[in-house]
């Protein structure tokens, strides 16, 4: 009801803050643009004055079936990761809920509702947890394939890409038949030790091998994959190293050369929560260091990376790049107040990694989440 009256709501805080930093790709703006022509049909004609819907038509499915996940990322927590629940339980903390939080108490009712709308859906987004290890993802794909709509729907994934098979099914066989597909690979580091710390217990070689498989099999203009790091206080200073790794190992997707999409996606996610890992919450000395690293990155990217792209997309790619980098500076110029004790130990574990320390295990991760 508040939204219908043009009032801000607490649930949209993330979009408001990201738009303040200059993000033009927030969910709010994206869906207003894509489904704006359906406003009269879906909102005005279907919504009562008190905000209730008379009928519901699901043109877009946004699936986060449960918190089932095989990683315990430093920037995540038990609500979105079953592995985090397991780790916290081993620490004696059992107050964080179920290991597998489902999106519906009645799975049969949920699937009956969804299946009943399968003939009108035009976009499906799979997130998590980790969607590629969730049985519901597999069941949905099987049904969509059975009604011959795999090639008629736009599919979007957010995945850690640690594995691309479920039971005896390699999802690449489905993906090759999707005419409109985009896979967003959540990868925050290209150094094995640092990745294992930030996205425990991810193994870089396995992810890179799966990226190569995507490059080999997703060959059409509308079959794309992108990397979407979560930029935060622990990895933003290595943004140049990250892109350099993809360049030196010939890992750029085809879409990198053909559009400015790469510039938008790779810089899109600037962490807001947990706020003690946000670059806005960094101590002043670290903010100054990040600004210097971003300046070096800007010059290098325009000099070394932009010329690799097809000539007709270089100008728009520079414009997109400049816009996205400005968001980092806006975030650094913002301030989030947190307890000063966070700053005392925040960078210590990764400083040890930089000095080639071999002491790295899950306890570092639980400490970093708990500080």
Predicted regions and their residues:
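Core AdoMet radical
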Residues: 58-68, 79-106, 118-136, 147-167, ...
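N-terminal pre-core extensions flanking Radical SAM catalytic domains
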Residues: 1-101, 117-119, 309-359
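Glycine-centered loop/turn positions within well-structured domains
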Residues: 10, 71, 192-193, 365
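Single conserved hydrophobic/aromatic residue that forms the stacking wall/gate
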Residues: 356, 360-371
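Alpha-helical packing segments of well-folded alpha/beta enzyme cores
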Residues: 8-11, 61, 110-113, 140, ...
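Distinct, well-ordered alpha-helical segments
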Residues: 136-142, 166-174, 238-240
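Leucine-rich repeat
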Residues: 5, 111-117, 142-148, 172-176
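Conserved C-terminal portion of the radical SAM core fold
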Residues: 156, 178-184, 203-357
């Amino acid at each position: 009801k508040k939204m219908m009256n043009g009032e801000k709501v607490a649930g949209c805080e993330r979009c408001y803050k990201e738009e303040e930093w200059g993000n033009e790709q927030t969910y709010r703006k994206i869906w207003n643009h894509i489904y704006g022509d359906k406003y009269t049909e879906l909102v005005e004609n279907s919504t009562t004055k008190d905000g209730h819907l008379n009928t519901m038509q699901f043109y877009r499915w946004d699936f986060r079936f449960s918190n089932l996940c095989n990683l315990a990322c430093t920037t995540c927590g038990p609500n979105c990761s079953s592995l985090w629940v397991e780790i916290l339980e081993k620490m004696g903390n059992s107050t964080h809920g179920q290991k597998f939080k489902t999106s519906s108490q009645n799975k049969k009712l949920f699937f009956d509702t969804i299946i009943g709308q399968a003939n009108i859906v035009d976009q499906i987004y799979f997130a998590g947890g980790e969607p590629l290890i969730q049985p519901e993802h597999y069941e949905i794909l099987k049904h969509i394939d059975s009604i011959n709509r795999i090639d008629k729907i736009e599919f979007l994934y957010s995945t850690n890409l640690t594995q691309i098979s479920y039971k005896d099914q390699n999802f690449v066989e489905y993906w090759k038949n999707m005419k409109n597909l985009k896979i967003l690979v959540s990868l925050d580091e290209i150094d094995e030790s640092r990745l294992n710390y930030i996205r425990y217990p991810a193994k870089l070689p396995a992810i890179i091998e799966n990226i190569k498989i995507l490059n080999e099999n997703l060959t059409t203009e509308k079959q794309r994959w992108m990397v979407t790091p979560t930029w935060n206080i622990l990895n933003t200073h290595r943004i140049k190293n990250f892109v350099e790794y993809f360049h030196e190992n010939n890992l750029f997707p085809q879409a990198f050369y053909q559009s400015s999409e790469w510039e938008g996606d790779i810089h899109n996610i600037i962490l807001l929560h947990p706020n003690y890992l946000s670059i806005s919450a960094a101590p002043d000395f670290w903010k100054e260091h990040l600004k210097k690293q971003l300046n070096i990155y800007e010059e290098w990217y325009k000099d070394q990376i932009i010329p690799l792209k097809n000539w007709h997309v270089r100008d728009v790619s520079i414009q997109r790049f400049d816009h996205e980098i400005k968001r980092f500076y806006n975030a650094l110029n913002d301030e989030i107040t947190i307890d000063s004790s966070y700053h005392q130990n925040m960078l210590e574990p990764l400083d040890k990694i930089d000095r080639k320390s071999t002491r790295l295990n899950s306890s570092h991760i639980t400490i970093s989440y708990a500080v």
